[in-house]
């Protein structure tokens, strides 16, 4: 609760090799972000996530594993690869799950992978509050991510990224 992260970045690899199927959240910046005053803004990640989700309560996101209780991701960017060796879990380029009442606006997902959605891995949650969520063309992800606002060319994504005013670097 009450966590504020601004102009933060992460570059690296996260490997999950859980064999028991217990609930957990994994994110490039934060595992679980919750509470109305919690915010990730103007942040970015370049991640490789290697997952083998055993159950749907295992969540992986390029920025946040689970976003809930009015916590928010805004003006942020994620790139990289997420490989889920199973068809289980909630795996998303930006967030694993947005349940319950997380907010996402003005994000770009330049994530490719196996058994991963571009934006949110929780495609069954109908009350998602996701706006201005973009993916970059040419990335291999699961089709029909209902939370993608539109698909951008790489040039369009670079222009939009400049507008996000992210000053942190990945170096």
Predicted feature locations:
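Predominantly extracellular beta-rich ligand-binding scaffolds that present long acidic/polar faces
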Residues: 1-171
């Amino acid at each position: 609760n009450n966590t504020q992260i601004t102009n933060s970045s992460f570059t690296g690899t996260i490997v999950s090799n859980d064999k028991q199927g217990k609930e957990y959240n994994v994110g490039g910046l934060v595992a679980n972000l919750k509470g109305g005053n919690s915010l990730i803004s103007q942040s970015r990640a370049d991640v490789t996530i290697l997952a083998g989700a055993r159950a749907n309560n295992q969540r992986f996101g390029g920025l946040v594993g689970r976003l809930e209780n009015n916590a928010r991701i805004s003006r942020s960017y994620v790139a990289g690869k997420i490989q889920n060796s199973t068809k289980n879990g909630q795996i998303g380029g930006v967030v694993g799950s947005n349940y319950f009442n997380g907010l996402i606006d003005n994000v770009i997902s330049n994530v490719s992978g196996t058994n991963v959605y571009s934006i949110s891995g929780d495609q069954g949650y109908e009350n998602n509050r996701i706006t201005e969520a973009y993916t970059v063309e040419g990335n291999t992800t699961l089709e029909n991510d209902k939370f993608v606002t539109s698909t951008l060319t790489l040039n369009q994504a670079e222009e939009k990224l400049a507008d996000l005013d992210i000053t942190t670097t990945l170096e």
